[in-house]
Amino acid sequence: MAYNKIPPRWLNCPRRGQPVAGRFLPLKTMLGPRYDSQVAEENRFHPSMLSNYLKSLKVKMSLLVDLTNTSRFYDRNDIEKEGIKYIKLQCKGHGECPTTENTETFIRLCERFNERSPPELIGVHCTHGFNRTGFLICAFLVEKMDWSIEAAVATFAQARPPGIYKGDYLKELFRRYGDIEEAPPPPVLPDWCFEDEDEEDEDEDGKKDSEPGSSASFSKRRKERLKLGAIFLEGITVKGVTQVTTQPKLGEVQQKCHQFCGWEGSGFPGAQPVSMDKQNIRLLEQKPYKVSWKADGTRYMMLIDGTNEVFMIDRDNSVFHVSNLEFPFRKDLRMHLSNTLLDGEMIIDKVNGQAVPRYLIYDIIKFNAQPVGDCDFNIRLQCIEREIISPRHEKMKTGLIDKTQEPFSVRPKQFFDINISRKLLEGNFAKEVSHEMDGLIFQPIGKYKPGRCDDILKWKPPSLNSVDFRLKITRMGGEGLLPQNVGLLYVGGYERPFAQIKVTKELKQYDNKIIECKFENNSWVFMRQRIDKSFPNAYNTAMAVCNSISNPVTKEMLFEFIDRCAAAAQGQKRKYPLDPDTELMPPPPPKRLHRPT
C-alpha cells in the first residue's frame, strides 16, 4: 500500500460502533489531516472527532488499543493529549486470527485499565474495526466476564453491524470458546465492503489481506457479494424468478460468468458501452458497425447451464434463478443447452394494455462451452437465431414447450446496417416498438469484450443524456448563512462531490440511494431511482456524459455523418471531410455543469 494512500474500503466504512457491554468502543482507524486531500469532509475521521464524540456521550476513555501494523494513519500525540493512554498491539490479519499471545496481552491490558472505578471506555481499532477488533473484544467478554461465545459474537454484531465478517475468525472463536460446529456463517457484507474493487486488499504494512469470509483472496469474495432484496424487474412481478442468496450456488454462477467472459476484475462482467461524442463518432468510418435501438430496459446476462439451471445476472452481480424456461439443443431437442452465456436486456412490452416481460438477446459469449464470443458479431447474431431461438420454436410446435407457463418470453434483438439509423428513430419502426426506446446502440463487428468497451457507442438525444449518482443530503451553512439541506452528487472513484442538486420534498427519500439525473436548464434534475444499481457511474463515465451534454452529437449531426460514411463507402467523391464539426454545428454549450475542480 502506498504510504500516503487511504486504506481500501475505508472511506464509507462506519467510523465507530456503539459501546459493547459498557466497556469497549469499536472503531475504524482514524486518519490524520495529511489525508484530507483524499477524503471528503463528510467522510473524515480525525482523532479530534473521537474526543468530541466522547464528550457528547459524557464518558471518558482511559485506553485506546491500536491493532494495526503501522503508525502512519494518525499521530498518537493527538490521542494522548486528551488524556487517553495509547497502546500499539500489532495483530497480523491477512487471514490469521489474533494469536493466543495477542489475546492474552489484550486481556491483561484491558483488565488492568478496567479496574478503574467508575469503569471508563476502552477504544479498540484495527483498519476497519470489525474482525481483529471484534475477535479480541469477544475473547475478553468470554474469559473475563463469563459470557458465552454466542452472546459475545451476537452482541458485538449488534453494536458494530454486521459484526465479525471473516469466517475463519468466527470458527476460531468457537473453536477456542465453544463448539466449532456451531460457528455461524459469515454475515452478508455491506456495500462499503465492495468499494475500491480494482485494488488488492492490503493491510497497513503492504501485505495482501484475505477475503472477508475465508482465507482465500478478497477479490474472489467480492465476486460472491450478496445484495438482499434485489428486484428483478421494476414495476412488475415476474413469476418463477427468485433471487439466489445461498452459497455455493451464488458464487458458482458469478464465477462461471467471469470465466466465460475472460473477466479478471470483480462485479458484473458484461460489455459496457460509452457515450458517443464528436471524437469517437469517427469510429463509424474506421471499422464496420451494426446499429440497433436502445431500449430503456434492464441489463441482464443469462447463464444456461442445464435443465432448470437458467440464471439471470444483473449489473449489481445479483443472481436470479428462472424456472420453467427451456433451451433445447438444436441437434437433439430432448437435450438441454449448458455452458451457454447470453447478453441482453429485460424490457416490458405493452400488448393490448397488458405489461408483457421479454428478454431481448443481443449477444452471445459461450455456446455449449464453445467461445463464440471470439467470432465476429454477424456470426454471433446467426448463432443466437439458429442455436437459441429456432430450437425453442421447433419444440413449441410439438407442444413440448408451453409458452403460457414461461415467466417471460425470449426474443433476439435485431441489428441493422448503420444506414438504417434514421429509420429507427424517425420512421414507422419507432412507433411500432411496444416498449420505451431512448436512443441507438452502435455495435462493432469485432469479438466480444467484457467491461468498458470504448468501441461500443450509445447515442441518446442530448436531452436524455444522464448520469447515475449517489445522492447524499447534507446540512450545510456558513458564517451569516442559515443552514440548509444540500444534495451532493457523488460518482465512483472520486471522493469529493461531483455536483449538487436542489433538495425537494420528493428527493429526500432517496438519500444515499443511486439516482439517475439529467442536465436541464443548467442544473441537474432528478429522473428516477436506479434500484438495479448499488454503485454510481465511475468518474470517467460521468465526465464522458458531461462532455456529450456540453458538446453534443445532435440527431442531425449523426445522420449527416452516417450519410457521408455511406457515400465514402460507395466510392463517391467526398464533398466534405468526414468531420462532424464541419457542419450542422450544435447550439452553444450550456453553462458549466458543476463539474469537480
UniProtKB/Swiss-Prot annotation:
Cellular localisation: Nucleus
GO cellular component, one term: nucleus
Chain segments carrying region Disordered: 181-221, 573-597
Binding site for GTP: R299, R315, D343, G344, E345, K458, W459, K460, R528, Q529, R530, I531, D532, K533
Catalytic activity: a 5'-end triphospho-ribonucleoside in mRNA + H2O = a 5'-end diphospho-ribonucleoside in mRNA + phosphate + H(+); a 5'-end diphospho-ribonucleoside in mRNA + GTP + H(+) = a 5'-end (5'-triphosphoguanosine)-ribonucleoside in mRNA + diphosphate
Ranges of Acidic residues composition bias in the record: 193-204
Effect noted on mutating R132A: Loss of TPase activity
Entry keyword set: GTP-binding, Hydrolase, mRNA capping, mRNA processing, Multifunctional enzyme, Nucleotide-binding, Nucleotidyltransferase, Nucleus, Protein phosphatase, Transferase
Domain Tyrosine-protein phosphatase stretches: 25-183
Protein's job: Bifunctional mRNA-capping enzyme exhibiting RNA 5'-triphosphate monophosphatase activity in the N-terminal part and mRNA guanylyltransferase activity in the C-terminal part. Catalyzes the first two steps of cap formation: by removing the gamma-phosphate from the 5'-triphosphate end of nascent mRNA to yield a diphosphate end, and by transferring the GMP moiety of GTP to the 5'-diphosphate terminus of RNA via a covalent enzyme-GMP reaction intermediate.
Protein family per UniProt: In the N-terminal section; belongs to the non-receptor class of the protein-tyrosine phosphatase family. In the C-terminal section; belongs to the eukaryotic GTase family.
Subunit structure: Interacts with SUPT5H and RNMT. Interacts with POLR2A (via C-terminus); this enhances guanylyltransferase activity. Binds (via GTase domain) to the elongating phosphorylated form of RNA polymerase II; can form direct interactions with the phosphorylated POLR2A C-terminal domain and indirect interactions via bound RNA.
Protein name: mRNA-capping enzyme
